[in-house]
């Protein structure tokens, strides 16, 4: 079945098949933890949505790996991604970009859930706040920077927000000390943000892949 890549839509068959597989994988992972039903619901929801949109690239290994991780080890991050999509819908006009999502193993929204205006945010396999993706610079931000965060969430799974958040807290504290002892001539917020955010290893990884380090 062929579809216009600019349209948010695709295959009922793929939605049903991927939804069923996602539910099966996720519930199997959740069963030993007593979370078979909630994990299964998340796996089914992610599978149905991504299947309909034809997100996973089944023509190469990456697509199978992405689906497997999203439906098992990284299911908490996948759940967060489903929630972020729902919040984007509540906000209104999430503006899904199929050209950056179809067979790209990620879901991209020009608007969507954006807690910090002007910043792109990636939650699980969902990228929101992409902006005007007709501009090459914005497209490269998604393909080279945010895509790294999508895969970080997959590989590190439930550890990802813990590791990222721990650095933010520790880096922020270090930034305060640095400002107080050596860099009082600079804006306090800038020093703290540099240590907490820009020096975060996960951000260094993404900015380096994007070719924008130092940012």
Give the positions of each predicted feature:
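Catalytic Zn2+-binding segment of zinc metalloproteases
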Residues: 147-165
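Short pre-active-site segment immediately N-terminal to the catalytic Zn-binding motif
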Residues: 118-120, 127-144, 197
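Metalloprotease/metallohydrolase-associated module, dominated by Zn2+-dependent proteases
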Residues: 10-23, 48, 61, 65-89, ...
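Generic hydrophobic alpha-helical membrane-segment signal
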Residues: 58, 113, 133-137
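Extended, hydrophobic alpha-helical membrane-active domains that insert into or remodel lipid bilayers
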Residues: 1-62
């Amino acid at each position: 079945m062929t579809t216009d890549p600019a349209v948010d839509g695709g295959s009922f068959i793929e939605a049903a098949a991927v939804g069923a597989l996602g539910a099966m994988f996720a519930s199997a992972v959740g069963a030993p933890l007593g979370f078979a039903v909630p994990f299964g619901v998340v796996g089914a929801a992610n599978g149905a949505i991504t299947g309909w949109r034809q997100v996973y690239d089944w023509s190469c290994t990456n697509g199978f790996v992405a689906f497997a991780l999203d439906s098992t080890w990284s299911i908490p991050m996948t759940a967060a991604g489903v929630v972020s999509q729902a919040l984007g819908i509540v906000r209104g006009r999430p503006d899904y970009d199929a050209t950056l999502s179809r067979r790209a193993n990620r879901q991209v929204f020009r608007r969507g859930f954006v807690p910090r205006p002007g910043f792109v945010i990636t939650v699980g396999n969902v990228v929101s706040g992409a902006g005007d993706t007709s501009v090459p610079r914005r497209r490269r931000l998604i393909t080279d920077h945010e895509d790294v965060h999508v895969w970080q969430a997959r590989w590190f799974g439930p550890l990802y927000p813990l590791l990222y958040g721990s650095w933010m807290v520790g880096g922020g504290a270090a930034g305060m000390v640095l400002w107080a002892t050596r860099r009082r001539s600079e804006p306090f917020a800038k020093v703290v943000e540099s240590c907490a955010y820009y020096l975060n290893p996960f951000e260094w990884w993404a900015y380096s892949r994007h070719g924008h380090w130092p940012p």
